[in-house]
């Protein structure tokens, strides 16, 4: 019993860190400079809410099994939607062209998993659900629950991979857009994504493989929450400091100028004079759009130049 209480206290720490981060992001939302940053803030708020719900389930799993059985649909739903919303944040930050709406089909699989668990909660008797989670008996309910857990894990891995691929593609294009090497690297986001895969598989594996795994690990669970808390803090601080570069979409006017070829033709001397006078290479926040505006030219032409 003491071990269960200790485990519950350990699992409550990520709930607190997510709540504090949620408050800080919420207070900063009104300061967001543009629509894109506000979208990122709203998505982060959603992620922190889902993380709080997930880790609250781990607390219940440790101290009150009956409560966890009733809470299971919420735990499943939050765990399945977290990777999608993290991918949504990556999708917004790494946008390199026209601002496209996030495809709704990304929410279909998590929604199906949620509906499946909710149907089990309403149809299957409580004791049968309890047995499917905590006993080693074989039944249709336990098979569905185990399969759903595995799909949730695979979903987290899949969207982590998609996020990393999108960051890789973004890095290739942002090099010609901004001189801010630190902010455009997104190393912090890649680290969070990779770290989270390892973090989430450990506690979920305890549920999939059986409660005995929790007992065998014992006090080592105290160390599994450290990456979670660290992830919450790193994500919060980087969003608050806007440690990323948003590539602005090409405006209609720029498209018109590019199509007509009606922009200033840049000569070597003119560019060298601009670099000598403005010294943009000393400004870490310099963007190619700034140079295009100053030279009355087009960003595509300047990139090629």
What residues fall within each predicted segment?
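The cytoplasmic-loop to transmembrane-helix boundary for the fourth helix
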Residues: 94-123, 140-149, 180-196
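Cytoplasmic membrane-interface regions of multi-pass membrane proteins
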Residues: 30-31, 91-98, 165-181
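Interfacial "cap-and-anchor" motif at the non-cytosolic start of specific transmembrane alpha-helices
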Residues: 193-250
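Membrane-water interface of transmembrane alpha-helices
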Residues: 21, 82, 157-171
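Extracellular-loop-to-transmembrane junctions of the mid-late helices
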Residues: 3-14, 120-126, 134-165, 218-221
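Membrane-proximal linker segments that couple transmembrane helices to downstream signaling/catalytic modules
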Residues: 237-305
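Juxtamembrane "helix-exit" motif on the non-cytosolic side of transmembrane helices
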Residues: 28-30, 56-67, 121-132, 204-215
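N-terminal low-complexity or simple alpha-helical regulatory segments
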Residues: 1-119, 137
């Amino acid at each position: 019993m003491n071990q269960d209480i200790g485990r519950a206290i350990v699992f409550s720490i990520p709930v607190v860190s997510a709540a504090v981060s949620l408050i800080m992001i919420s207070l900063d939302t009104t300061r967001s400079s543009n629509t894109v940053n506000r979208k990122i803030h709203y998505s982060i708020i959603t992620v922190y809410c889902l993380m709080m719900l997930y880790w609250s389930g781990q607390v219940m799993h440790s101290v009150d099994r009956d409560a966890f059985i009733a809470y299971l649909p919420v735990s499943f739903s939050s765990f399945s939607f977290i990777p999608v919303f993290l991918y949504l944040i990556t999708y917004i930050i790494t946008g390199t062209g026209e601002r496209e709406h996030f495809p709704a089909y990304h929410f279909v699989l998590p929604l199906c998993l949620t509906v499946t668990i909710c149907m089990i909660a309403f149809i299957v008797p409580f004791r049968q659900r309890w047995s499917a989670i905590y006993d080693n008996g074989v039944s249709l309910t336990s098979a569905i629950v185990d399969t759903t857990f595995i799909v949730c894990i695979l979903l987290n891995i899949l969207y982590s991979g998609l996020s990393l691929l999108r960051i890789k593609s973004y890095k290739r294009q942002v090099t010609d857009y901004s001189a801010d090497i630190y902010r455009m690297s997104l190393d912090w986001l890649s680290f969070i994504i990779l770290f989270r895969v390892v973090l989430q598989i450990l506690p979920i594996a305890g549920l999939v493989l059986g409660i005995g795994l929790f007992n065998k690990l014992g006090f080592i669970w105290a160390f599994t929450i450290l990456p979670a808390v660290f992830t919450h803090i790193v994500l919060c601080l980087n969003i608050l400091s806007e440690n990323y570069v948003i590539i602005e979409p090409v405006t209609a006017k720029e498209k018109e100028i590019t199509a007509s070829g009606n922009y200033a033709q840049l000569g070597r001397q003119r560019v060298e004079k601009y670099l000598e006078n403005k010294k943009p290479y000393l400004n870490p926040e310099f963007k190619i759009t700034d140079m295009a505006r100053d030279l009355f030219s087009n960003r595509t032409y300047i990139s090629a130049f």
